[in-house]
Amino acid sequence: MPAAVALVTPDPSATGVPLSVMFDLGMAADSMMLVAWELGIGSVPATVYRQGLARELLGYPEDHHCEFLLSFGYPADPAELTRPLQSGGRRPLDELVHEDRW
């Protein structure tokens, strides 16, 4: 059965809220997604664009903000977890990564 997690923080635009709260939020989301994958559970982040609607549905306080949601679920086909990466569509790494100079 799929599940979702709402990542709610103090409003990052409010006075006194450190910008690091967004970094911390990203780190927490990343950790949840990595642990889920280790357990064979897939995940997808979704940005919340309509704060008013999210607040109404989830009931979090006015002085808080829900930047995004994480959805979790088992893949429909377990073989997808072990299939090797397929080539196609990706640029070679040496076109994207530069060392010392561009």
Task: Give the positions of each predicted feature.
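Glycine/small-residue-rich phosphate/adenosyl-binding loop
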Residues: 1-25
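Short secondary-structure boundary segments
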Residues: 9, 47-48, 74
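Hydrophobic pocket-lining residues that define ligand/cofactor binding sites across diverse proteins
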Residues: 33-36
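Structured binding elements
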Residues: 40
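Active-site helix/loop module of the DD-peptidase/beta-lactamase fold
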Residues: 46-63
